[in-house]
């Protein structure tokens, strides 16, 4: 009961904060300060992690860079705010960050009660389980009685409880606030099982002391549509963040890459001309509050969606995650962009 009351109070408080924070045009604020403030994970290889020099890279980081490129024509005009699962929502609601690009699941509660706008989904994921091979477990249905490491304040924690209850299994939750704490506890043997989004398991396995000693079980127990989130009340900023994603998708579909984007401006295809802002009467960029070079600037900065995926989490990365649902609609996946016209 106490937890429900606290949750209700938090929801009411952040709704009030959100209404104030979104009253001003975010684009104007971003331009005035000269950079995009992007909320990211505290450190998740492939998605958002700093190197020894403090330089950030990853799938979500590239989205932050793409937004900066669209707004300023300069992908370096972005600053990163590392946030834990517990910290991320207050940071967005209060205006501390302009956009949250932090492997965050879109849910009805977050979309309504917390006052966020999600969509589009830039990564379709699902929750899974990682165990030590020595446990001799082949299925999540064999995990009854196991100690399970999980991060609090996440859909992962809620899905875990639902899955074990539905399947009449018992488990002992080992709960931590920060991802680094969960990872360290699992690596130290404080729990038998690690559960989070499957993409996260592939990422976190790389950081373990003996990665090859661990396996990811086949079950996917949830739908985890991940993507950037912004505050409600600013449709222009929401449109910009959304169309940054769609530009990445459309670029891949058109075959426009980081290497050939300038050459593709010469394409006779009117759809490509319109997309790249070279059509004589194109107003797509200005309708967004950007220049007509917005899509070109995005692609020059980070490439297309396929390039962003492969470089950070796909075939060209240590994670080697397959595209799956995140392939384009015409290649067996469900990623596609609305018409650019």
List where the protein language model places each region.
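Bacterial N-terminal signal peptides that target proteins for export
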Residues: 1-9
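Sec/Tat signal peptide C-region and signal peptidase I cleavage site
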Residues: 17-24
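Extracytoplasmic small-molecule ligand-binding "clamshell" domains
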Residues: 24, 31-101, 283-284, 290-293, ...
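Sec-exported extracytoplasmic/periplasmic mature domains
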Residues: 31-32, 68-76, 93-97, 105, ...
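Bilobed "Venus flytrap"/periplasmic-binding protein-like clamshell domains
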Residues: 37-46, 56-71, 105, 125-181
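Acidic, polar ligand-binding/catalytic clefts
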Residues: 65, 69, 73, 77-142, ...
């Amino acid at each position: 009961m106490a937890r429900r009351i606290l949750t209700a109070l938090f929801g009411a408080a952040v709704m009030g904060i959100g209404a104030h924070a979104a009253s001003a045009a975010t684009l104007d604020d971003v331009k005035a300060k000269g950079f995009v403030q992007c909320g990211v994970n505290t450190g998740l290889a492939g998605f958002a992690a700093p190197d020894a020099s403090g330089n950030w890279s990853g799938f979500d980081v590239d989205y932050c860079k793409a937004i900066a490129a669209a707004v300023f024509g300069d992908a370096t005009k972005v600053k990163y705010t590392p946030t834990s699962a517990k910290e991320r929502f207050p940071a967005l609601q209060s205006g501390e960050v302009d956009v949250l690009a932090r492997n965050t699941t879109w849910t009805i509660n977050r979309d309504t009660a917390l006052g966020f706008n999600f969509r589009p989904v830039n990564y379709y994921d699902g929750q899974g389980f990682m165990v030590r091979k020595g446990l001799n477990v082949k299925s999540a249905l064999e995990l009854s009685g196991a100690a399970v490491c999980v991060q609090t304040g996440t859909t992962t924690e809620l899905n875990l409880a639902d899955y074990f209850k539905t399947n009449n299994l018992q488990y002992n939750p080992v709960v931590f606030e920060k991802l680094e704490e969960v990872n360290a506890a699992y690596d130290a043997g404080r729990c038998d099982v690690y559960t989070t989004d499957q993409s996260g398991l592939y990422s976190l396995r790389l950081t373990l002391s003996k990665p090859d000693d661990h396996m990811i079980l086949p079950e996917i127990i949830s739908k985890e549509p991940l993507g950037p989130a912004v505050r409600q009340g600013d449709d222009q900023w929401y449109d910009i963040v959304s169309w940054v994603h769609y530009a990445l998708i459309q670029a891949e579909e058109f075959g426009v890459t980081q290497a050939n984007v300038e050459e593709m401006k010469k394409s006779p295809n009117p759809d490509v001309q319109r997309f790249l802002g070279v059509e004589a009467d194109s107003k797509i960029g200005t309708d967004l509050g950007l220049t007509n070079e917005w899509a070109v600037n995005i692609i020059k900065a980070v490439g297309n969606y396929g390039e962003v995926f492969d470089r950070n989490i796909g075939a060209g990365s240590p994670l080697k995650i397959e595209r799956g649902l995140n392939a384009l609609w015409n290649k067996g996946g469900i990623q596609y962009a609305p018409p650019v016209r």
